[in-house]
């Protein structure tokens, strides 16, 4: 038994010692279970109900702070409502994501628009869900290659995340327990291709590598690490398209994010555990109000956040590590 699983069990056992259920929440609990297709054994229901009620309290507290203008983003009860903090951390990348300061192809006289959303060009595929598998790293890599493939061919083809999970173990990745986008890009480059989701579908678990060269739909010639600053990140995003990034996504507020610009006081720029796709930037309100944000695509399904996307503070000292681990491929 792994330490992470052992801790998760301890958290659930601790929930058993919680007070009896708040019966005033019965209807809300039953509705939440229906909406999220949750079924439990009688004993597990007691445990999950206790965890869920604690999360309800946390969300109410956050909402009250919003009313006092202490926050400017919202959170909500979603499919993760019955999960402990440790269980949610197991869904993120357990690998320590670090990179040396990189270089990228810098073009001169690049015009930087005030706002940018690569979704408007059609080069961003629909949001997908990683489920209970900690493969965010693979989703961000596949998504960045999808965008480059569209820019080159005009075809938006969802690529196989499962191909990356199964076939990068020999590169040091840990399948559903985390992996490094850098080594995933290395695999695609060295392997000479990557399959589509249609021929190598997602299973949310590790299986043996079943890649077949004749089914490959894309190759990458090389990939680049963006220097660790937001100015370089913006220039790369404008010039080359959506970028695979990583942030600190370890907080309960992240898993239950609903909308707005995500300000988490405990978010760190040197603790990176969740991969996303950077697709744009903008600002809320008037430009002079300095409410600037980065726009990111997550892999928790469309029910999470703003239809699967989130906004992260921009030009605020590399908030949550947005510029600490950024890469893009070229075909």
From Swiss-Prot:
Protein name according to UniProt: Cathepsin 7
Catalytic residues identified in the record: 136, 274, 298
Subcellular location: Endosome; Lysosome; Cytoplasm, Perinuclear region; Golgi apparatus
Disulfide bonds: 133-176, 167-209, 267-320
TM region(s), chain numbering: none
Any one annotated GO CC term: lysosome
Function, in words: Involved in trophoblast cell proliferation and differentiation probably by affecting mitotic cell cycle progression. Proteolytic activity and nuclear localization are essential for its role in cell cycle progression.
Organism: Rattus norvegicus (Rat)
E.C. designation(s): 3.4.22.-
Residue positions the entry lists as glycosylated: 72
UniProt key word Ligase: no
């Amino acid at each position: 038994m792994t330490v992470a699983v052992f801790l998760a069990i301890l958290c659930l056992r601790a929930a058993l010692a919680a007070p009896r259920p708040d019966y005033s929440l019965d209807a809300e609990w039953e509705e939440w279970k229906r909406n999220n297709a949750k079924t439990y054994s009688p004993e597990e229901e007691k445990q999950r109900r206790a965890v869920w009620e604690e999360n309800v309290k946390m969300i109410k507290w956050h909402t009250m702070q919003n009313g006092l203008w202490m926050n400017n983003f919202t959170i909500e009860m979603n499919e993760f409502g019955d999960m402990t903090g440790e269980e949610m951390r197991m869904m993120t990348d357990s690998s320590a994501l670090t990179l040396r300061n990189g270089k990228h192809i810098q073009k001169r006289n690049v015009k930087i628009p005030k706002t940018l959303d690569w979704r408007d060009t059609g080069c961003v595929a629909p949001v997908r869900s990683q489920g209970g598998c900690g493969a965010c790293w693979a989703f961000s890599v596949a998504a960045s290659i999808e965008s480059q493939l569209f820019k080159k061919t005009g075809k938006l083809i969802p690529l196989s995340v499962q191909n990356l999970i199964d076939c990068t173990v020999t590169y040091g990745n840990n399948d559903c327990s985390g992996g490094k986008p850098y080594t995933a890009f290395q695999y695609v480059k060295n392997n000479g291709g990557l399959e589509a989701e249609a021929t190598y579908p997602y299973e949310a678990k590790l299986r043996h590598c079943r890649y077949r060269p004749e089914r490959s739909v894309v190759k990458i010639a090389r990939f680049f690490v963006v220097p660790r600053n937001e100015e370089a990140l913006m220039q790369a995003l404008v010039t080359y398209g959506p970028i695979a990034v990583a942030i600190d996504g370890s907080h309960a507020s992240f898993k239950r994010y609903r909308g707005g610009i995500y300000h988490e006081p405990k978010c760190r720029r040197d603790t990176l555990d969740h991969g996303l796709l950077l697709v744009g930037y903008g600002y809320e309100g008037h430009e002079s109000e300095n409410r600037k944000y980065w726009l990111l695509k997550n892999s928790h399904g469309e029910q999470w956040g703003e239809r699967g996307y989130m906004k992260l503070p921009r030009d605020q000292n590399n908030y949550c590590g947005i510029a600490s681990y950024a890469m893009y491929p070229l075909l």
